Amino acid sequence: FKRPLNGEDDMREKIVLIDGHSILNRAFYGVPDLTNAEGLHTNAIYGFLNILFKILDEEQPEYLTVTFDVHAPTFRHEMYPEYKGTRKPMAEELRQQVPVIKEVLQAMNIATIEKAGLEADDLLGTISHSCEEKGMDVAIISGDRDTLQLATEHVKIRIPKTKQGRTEIEDYFASDVKEKYGVTPIEFIDVKALMGDTADNIPGVPGIGEKTATKIIVEYGNIENAHEHVSELKPPRASKNLDEFWDQAVLSKTLATIDIHADVPFDLETAR
């Protein structure tokens, strides 16, 4: 997955952006339960730091920031109150590790960022977009495949999997997303708009699964164009349902789209 480096790319500065809650979550469920002498659960902290050090060793970035979700309604909840409504609450053993990892990161002088009304994905998207525009390379570390829509030639999405305490990482530039999913990172949003997402409780269009959604988007490029040719869609049920549930498809696309122009108070120097 390493990109061939030419002279110019060697000169590009790099930032690593870590989706804090997502990686803690992955670590929590991937590392057996550990507690310290005071009875604090530490497995997520341990697993998170393992992933962090592995990434830093591989990426050697000039900048690093960890984003966190704020426990508050986001603009998506305001638009669709049922958004993420099926999520189970965070396990108490994991919840108690969140403030501790923030303290650990602070002690290590690692910048963290969170903002009410936005999800970590929006912070990742906005910061990665602005860093790429500055001519930097970006590595986003997240367990959430929604972030694949952010992949470009210079933004790499790294999805860690921890099994038996060992971490393996899947890497995606834009070309890798296309290779694995058959669509570009931007089209990935439209596939999700059609098929929905049970994890985030995004409704999508009834009766359209991943296969049909992918086929439609490969052929038509986006939901708007598919809707213009709705009578031609196969199978007939997909055609009928996209027409009938069009508003739901549009809503789903908005919910699934990461904001890359959010108002984020980010100062690159603090991430150095």
Where does each model-flagged region fall?
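Short, Lys/Arg-enriched N-terminal segments with co-localized hydrophobic residues
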Residues: 1-10
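Extended two-metal-dependent nuclease catalytic cores across DNA- and RNA-processing enzymes
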Residues: 13, 32-35, 85-266
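Non-catalytic, usually N-terminal nucleic-acid engagement modules in DNA/RNA processing proteins
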Residues: 11-65, 69, 75-80
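Short, intrinsically disordered, charge-balanced linker/junction segments flanking boundaries
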Residues: 6-7, 266-272
